[in-house]
């Protein structure tokens, strides 16, 4: 993990790290991502640090409350804050004398508690996906192929780092990371769009890894 993202050298090192993985410690969001996000403060220059810029946009899509729940690498998520109001006394004061009155108070407070919990929006389900995009032959312009893949824009889709990997006979494949919101983006639809829209460049697309975040 990069300790100092405020220096150009540290930011460049983090950009290199994100070319190989989606997040600070791998392919799952962690407390380190939240710390680096806070330390960075604002999105970096996308031309100079494209991988960090994409990572920043993804982390920024979460709320502060959600980022506080991310566990540090090898650790556990922090306990929920008491400020949520979940710790109020359901059973009222010890000075209550009538059982009926106590029961009424408990019932009212339980109803209010249940209503409050029901109104809380749950965390957005996201997944980190690594795709192998294979060209037809060694004459395919892989730079152009990557640009075409990244040109696909969907609500809930964020492209991450990418690299070229030799597969034999002078042919290389494009391996690219993407983070998707599960309710908004279908990986099958994304693959179909890549192979359908860019069939002159793309022979096939395979899923290398699929991890829930």
Curated annotation (Swiss-Prot):
GO terms for molecular function: guanyl-nucleotide exchange factor activity; translation elongation factor activity. SMART domains: EF-1_beta_acid (SM01182), EF1_GNE (SM00888). InterPro entries: eEF-1beta-like_sf (IPR036219), EF-1_beta_acid_region_euk (IPR018940), EF1B_bsu/dsu (IPR049720), EF1B_bsu/dsu_GNE (IPR014038), Glutathione-S-Trfase_C_sf (IPR036282), Transl_elong_EF1B/ribsomal_bS6 (IPR014717), Transl_elong_EF1B_B/D_CS (IPR001326). It holds the Pfam family EF1_GNE. Disulfide bonds: none annotated. The keyword Metal-binding does not apply. It comes from the Eukaryota. GO terms for cellular component: cytosol; eukaryotic translation elongation factor 1 complex. GO terms for biological process: translational elongation. Coiled coil: none annotated. Belongs to the EF-1-beta/EF-1-delta family. PANTHER family: EF-HAND AND COILED-COIL DOMAIN-CONTAINING FAMILY MEMBER, ELONGATION FACTOR 1-BETA. EF-1-beta and EF-1-delta stimulate the exchange of GDP bound to EF-1-alpha to GTP. EF-1 is composed of 4 subunits: alpha, beta, delta, and gamma. This is Probable elongation factor 1-beta/1-delta 1.
């Amino acid at each position: 993990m990069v300790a100092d993202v405020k220096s150009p050298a540290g930011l460049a090192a983090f950009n290199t790290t994100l070319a190989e993985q989606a997040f600070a410690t791998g392919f799952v969001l962690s407390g380190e991502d939240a710390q680096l996000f806070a330390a960075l403060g604002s999105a970096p220059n996308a031309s100079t640090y494209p991988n960090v810029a994409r990572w920043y946009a993804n982390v920024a899509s979460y709320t502060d409350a959600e980022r506080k729940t991310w566990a540090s690498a090898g650790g556990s998520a922090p306990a929920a804050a008491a400020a949520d109001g979940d710790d109020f006394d359901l059973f009222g004061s010890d000075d209550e004398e009538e059982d009926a009155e106590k029961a009424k108070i408990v019932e009212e407070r339980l109803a209010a508690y249940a209503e409050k919990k029901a109104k809380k929006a749950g965390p957005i389900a996201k997944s980190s996906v690594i795709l192998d995009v294979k060209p037809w032959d060694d004459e395919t312009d892989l730079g152009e192929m990557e640009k075409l893949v990244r040109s696909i824009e969907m609500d809930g889709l964020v492209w991450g780092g990418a690299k070229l990997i030799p597969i034999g006979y002078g042919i290389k494949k494009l391996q690219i990371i993407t983070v998707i919101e599960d309710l908004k983006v279908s990986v099958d639809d994304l693959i179909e769009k890549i192979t359908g829209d860019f069939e002159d460049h793309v022979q096939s697309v395979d899923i290398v890894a699929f991890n829930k975040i």
